[in-house]
């Protein structure tokens, strides 16, 4: 028996999740009545996810600001890098939202119990903007007011940097808290196969095999979003700003893009991207060693596109028709959430709560969406990481062009930014 347990634990988590997925489908089809006895596993998994949402949003964004605002990283080269990544991130969220609105992958999705979801009374735009600034920070954290939490996290991170030497110990504490949070998420993720087993079994028992149709449409939207992000955002930057020949650029980048797809990991892609940038693209070593590590931390076009797409998917699945103010809030919070995504596996799914909460969706409903999508996230992650790898090399080439025109970069080459797994 113990040998089987050890073999089970030795399997990669995504493989165990797939086993739980197939087992849940089988149980839901063959013994739908039995799903009532294992539904508590899905409920427990949802509660564990809800437990993580607020700490992830606050700690990851605050620590991200303190790390990014290192003066060594924010010279002229660093400032241009952040500006370009902010632009590509906003474009990526917009493209993801557009793909979701056009294809409508969430229509008819069987989320949780299938109970209708209703938004509360609409909040005027003025009040929504004013509510971004929390009157009581503790109350905002307890209530899961994500816009207020994001604002306070950014302000807290900036204040920590402005404190100088006195703020360094707390900045180190935030970095340590991020690593501890990573371990906590890893522990919760060990329960994922069982939570997925229960959630999928219940969904299949109630709705049949048609429950997977929406995932197919979602996967199609991810592919459309990645292609659109590269064609409509990266290619124009390469032509107009970096002055690069497109075919030659992507032939040089193919090694880094292949590693990004195969590993779904910025950590594995960064060394290859550095070699490609300096040897094949002839990008200045100082620029490459400054921009690419920053990009590994904040250059997540794939995540941004996915957060925008998944937000629209979730609203459609919950039967909510977004209006223009709601779409504007999704765009703003989606860009901020993607920019501050924590260095943890599938973090984009957890940051989804920050986006949906800003338009009135509860963390319980968001957790059900996460449980619905999570079994398939590995394959989707591989695809969207390609967009992030392309963005990192595109921005590096664009910054290199401007750096050559302005003279030597005034930022010290640094590899201090921690490469992270794409999420």
Give, region by region, the residue ranges found by the protein language model:
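Short, Lys/Arg-rich, polar N-terminal cytosolic tail immediately upstream
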Residues: 1-11
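Signature of multi-pass transmembrane helix bundles
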Residues: 8, 14, 18-21, 25-28, ...
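Juxtamembrane helix-boundary/capping and inter-helix hinge elements in multi-pass membrane proteins
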Residues: 32, 66-73, 79, 108, ...
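Membrane-water interface of transmembrane alpha-helices in multipass transporters/channels
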Residues: 34-38, 75, 173, 209-217, ...
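Transmembrane helix-bundle signature of multi-pass membrane transporters/permeases
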Residues: 44, 48, 61-62, 81-86, ...
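Membrane-interface alpha-helices at helix entry/exit sites of multi-pass transporters
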Residues: 73-80, 183-190, 280-295, 324-325, ...
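Alpha-helical membrane segments and immediately flanking helix-loop junctions
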Residues: 250-307, 335-349, 376-398
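Transmembrane alpha-helical segments and their short flanking loops
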Residues: 308-423
